[in-house]
Amino acid sequence: MAEGYVAPGFERVRDAFEAGLEEELGAGFAAVRAGEVLVDIWGGWADRERTRRWARETIAPVYSTTKGVSAIVMAWLADKGMLSYEDAVASLWPAFGAHGKDKLTIAQALAHQAGVPGFINPIDPDLWLDPPACAAAIAALEPMWPPGTASGYHPLTWGYIVGEIAMRAADRSLGAILREEICAPHGIDFQIGTPESEHARAAEVKKPSRVADFGEITPPRRAAFFTPWAAAKRGSSQWRQIEIPSANGHATALGVARLYEVYATGGEISGERLLSPGAFAQLVAPRFRGDDLVLPFNIDWRSGVIGNSNGFYGPNAEAIGHSGAGGSCGFGDPKAGVAAGYVMNKHSHHLMGDPRSLRLIEALYACL
């Protein structure tokens, strides 16, 4: 059974969530509109042994759903004049300009156009746990395609690039900016860099039983996902504590929904303006659309988030969102004025558009 709150008229969402719990280990789903909580429900188990119930305060690693939140932080930095989307990454980080990456803009890096989706040659997997060293290693990479000419999803490296840009622009880490400037003032439960004191409430992940279907394993896909060193020791205590702005956010479903409300409201959280209209327009401006060189989709890339061209985030083309490994997602829909977040700990093999989230989103829109 689901626990939590459902506003009158949104019972269909709870029914869909409870019907889907048979497929879950544990999960949460939340939706907000104009600062009002419409749905905030959870259920199932927070651990693989099924000894710890999923609770209101349970946080789950949301993997690449983190990217849409990091994109908001980058827009905040642009709004404060600390960076410009059209700046070359190398203007803040000269070493990144190696091997012809010198003209790549921050906007292009956010849209996965840098050409460095992973390490094709062997690395020590512990490198991922040392963000400054990992960022330096990424800066030294030769791009796998001419930067700025195509998109190829950077599942992990995106976060080290963005994190280094933020650190150089603001002299603070991206996770600290998120915590101090956005989450703490609004009481939002979303962390990039989760202190050890919070780990007891973190859900354990159950890995998928099958591998995602990427089609042909090309060199960019291999570098991004299919080398023995492509993962960053996910789930370890050290992994939870460091900041990976592409991959290791930990949150409740409500935390995801409240941050993605920025995309539904033109830059506001609970009625308070976070981003100026100009900064928000740059955040959601189309940056590149085409067949991605890593993910097997045609993707409408914005400044770190995804337009709804594939229908993963409800029926409206105006929606903006991002999905994470295993099934999590967050989105905001300015046409409907609604934002939602889905988190879980039983991972599926779906790269985007997990059927579990699609059913919940369909039920949500049926209630609007």
Describe each model-derived feature in a short phrase.
Residues 112, 158-165, 247-269, 328-345:
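Active-site-proximal alpha-helical segments within enzyme catalytic domains
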Residues 3-62, 82-84:
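Short, conserved catalytic-motif segment at the N-terminal edge
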Residues 244, 265-269, 279, 284-291, ...:
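Short, gly/Ser/Thr-rich active-site loops of penicillin-recognizing serine hydrolases
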Residues 56, 61-65, 69, 77-121, ...:
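Active-site helix/loop module of the DD-peptidase/beta-lactamase fold
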Residues 41, 124-146, 172-189, 230-232:
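Short, charged, amphipathic alpha-helices and their helix-cap/turn boundaries
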Residues 55-57, 141-148, 158-161, 236-245:
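Flexible glycine/proline-enriched surface loops and loop-helix/loop-strand junctions
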Residues 323-368:
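Structured C-terminal helix/loop/strand segments within mature extracytoplasmic catalytic/sensor domains
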Residues 204-253, 281-336:
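Active-site Gly/Thr loop motif
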